[in-house]
Amino acid sequence: TGEKSISCSECGKCFIKSSELTVHQMTHIGEKTYSCSECGKCFASLSHLRVHQKIHTGEKPFSCSECGKCFLNRGSLVRHHRTHTGEKPFFCSECGKRFAASSDLRVHRRTHTGEKPFSCSECEKRFLNPWSLVRHYRTHTGEKPFSCSECGKCFARSSDLTVHRRRSHTKEKPFSCSECGKCFTSSSELTVHLRTH
């Protein structure tokens, strides 16, 4: 029947198998018994450890039949495949906006609730999602982890590196104006241009 009959006493989440509930409950009590021999990071289940270990080996066994891009796990491949199909099965009940990944919907919902659960330990500024916090934190550390293979220039954000490569090296302009056909290296440049029409 597909009925989820076993629930977690801590948060109420339901499961079909008791083994799934056991693994889930470890996330509450902090019990993580499987550790990575490479970096020491710990996991609640062996399957999660095995997925993590592929980061060290570079193994990406799941490949996209459309474009050949490879992924660490099946879930990432499924999410990626939606970029080809345009499928967006997750929608916001507040505004109707649709998303390809449930995690994107979860972050989007915070724009309605105003929740910003991730805070900077340096300045207390708060963010909707963890990657925005990581990006922001680089303004304090000065870290620029993205370097150009052509000239060696470094950037704090991967998107800045992409725009730099287009401007300085490839001369690629993938964003075109539907009104006049003029092309731009970044979506932000196109947005500014569109205001002139």
Curated annotation (Swiss-Prot):
GO terms for molecular function: DNA-binding transcription factor activity, RNA polymerase II-specific; RNA polymerase II cis-regulatory region sequence-specific DNA binding; zinc ion binding. SUPFAM superfamilies: beta-beta-alpha zinc fingers. InterPro entries: Znf_C2H2_sf (IPR036236), Znf_C2H2_type (IPR013087). Keywords: DNA-binding, Metal-binding, Nucleus, Repeat, Transcription, Transcription regulation, Zinc, Zinc-finger. GO terms for biological process: regulation of transcription by RNA polymerase II. GO terms for cellular component: nucleus. It comes from the Eukaryota. It is found in: Nucleus. Transmembrane segments: none annotated. A zinc finger (C2H2-type) spans 6-28, 34-56, 62-84, 90-112, 118-140, 146-169, 175-197. Belongs to the krueppel C2H2-type zinc-finger protein family. May be involved in transcriptional regulation. This is Gastrula zinc finger protein XlCGF17.1. It comes from Xenopus laevis.
